[in-house]
């Protein structure tokens, strides 16, 4: 007697393959010649990375969850950049200089404009902010806040590097064709 699974009788695997979206993104990347990127975005990214040079030596080599879930793979560059640009907006609330925020805004908004994404990415609810534990001393809380700020800056630096790498990958791919 043949052992036939229920799901194969009703064709679920082929149905799932039909219903899965193609690996292409919903973003139509404009300015693939690189003029807008090189004249605005790359300048701001480089300014931000230059201002964060001293942070690199203090960063741990831990892998951030964002980069485990979102990578700049073939045919997914647009969605990676779109998500990364949205993530950059969260850093506008940090206590930083106006010049830093201006460059961050240019990269975030400029990337979003050049991507011309049509699909909406489902937003997540922001994580609930934890309250300080009453048993911890003031020094421990201060140390934890400093460590969190350093981790955020390390993530931001890595995010900017990944955005720059992804844009360069897109531009190199279009110049080869």
UniProtKB/Swiss-Prot annotation:
InterPro entries attached to this UniProt entry: IL-7, IL-7/IL-9_CS, IL7_sf
Function (record text): Hematopoietic cytokine that plays an essential role in the development, expansion, and survival of naive and memory T-cells and B-cells thereby regulating the number of mature lymphocytes and maintaining lymphoid homeostasis. Mechanistically, exerts its biological effects through a receptor composed of IL7RA subunit and the cytokine receptor common subunit gamma/CSF2RG.
Taxonomic source organism: Homo sapiens
Leader sequence residues: 1-25
Cysteine disulfide partners in this protein: 27-166, 59-154, 72-117
UniProt keywords, alphabetically: Cytokine, Disease variant, Disulfide bond, Glycoprotein, Growth factor, Secreted, Signal
Glycosylation sites: 95, 116, 141
Biological processes per GO annotation: animal organ morphogenesis; B cell proliferation; bone resorption; cell-cell signaling; cytokine-mediated signaling pathway; extrinsic apoptotic signaling pathway; homeostasis of number of cells within a tissue; humoral immune response
Superkingdom of source: Eukaryota
Pfam families reported for this sequence: IL7
UniProt disease annotation: Immunodeficiency 130 with HPV-related verrucosis: An autosomal recessive immunologic disorder characterized by susceptibility to human papillomavirus (HPV) infections that lead to the development of warts and verrucous or plaque-like skin lesions. There is an increased risk of skin malignancy. Some patients may also suffer from mycobacterial, herpes simplex virus (HSV), or fungal infections. Immunologic workup shows T-cell lymphopenia, particularly affecting CD4+ T cells.
Record GO terms (molecular function): cytokine activity; growth factor activity; interleukin-7 receptor binding
Subcellular location: Secreted
Coiled-coil regions, chain positions: none
Family: Belongs to the IL-7/IL-9 family.
GO CC terms in record: collagen-containing extracellular matrix; extracellular region; extracellular space
Protein name as it appears in the record: Interleukin-7
Complexes and interactors: Interacts with IL7R and CSF2RG.
């Amino acid at each position: 007697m043949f052992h036939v699974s229920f799901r194969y009788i009703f064709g679920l695997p082929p149905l799932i393959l039909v219903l899965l979206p193609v690996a292409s993104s919903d973003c139509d990347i404009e300015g693939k010649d690189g003029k807008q990127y090189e004249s605005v975005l790359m300048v701001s990214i480089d300014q931000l990375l230059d201002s964060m040079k001293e942070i690199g030596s203090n960063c741990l080599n831990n892998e951030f969850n964002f980069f485990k879930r979102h990578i700049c793979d073939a045919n997914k560059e647009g969605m990676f950049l779109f998500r990364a640009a949205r993530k950059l907006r969260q850093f506008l609330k940090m206590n930083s200089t106006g010049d830093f925020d201006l460059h961050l805004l240019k990269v975030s908004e400029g990337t979003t404009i050049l991507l011309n994404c049509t699909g909406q990415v489902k937003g997540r609810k922001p994580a609930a902010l934890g309250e300080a534990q009453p048993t911890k001393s003031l020094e421990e809380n201060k140390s934890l806040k400093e460590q969190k700020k350093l981790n955020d800056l390390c993530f931001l630096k890595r995010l900017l590097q990944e955005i720059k790498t992804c844009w360069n990958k897109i531009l190199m791919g279009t110049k080869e064709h």
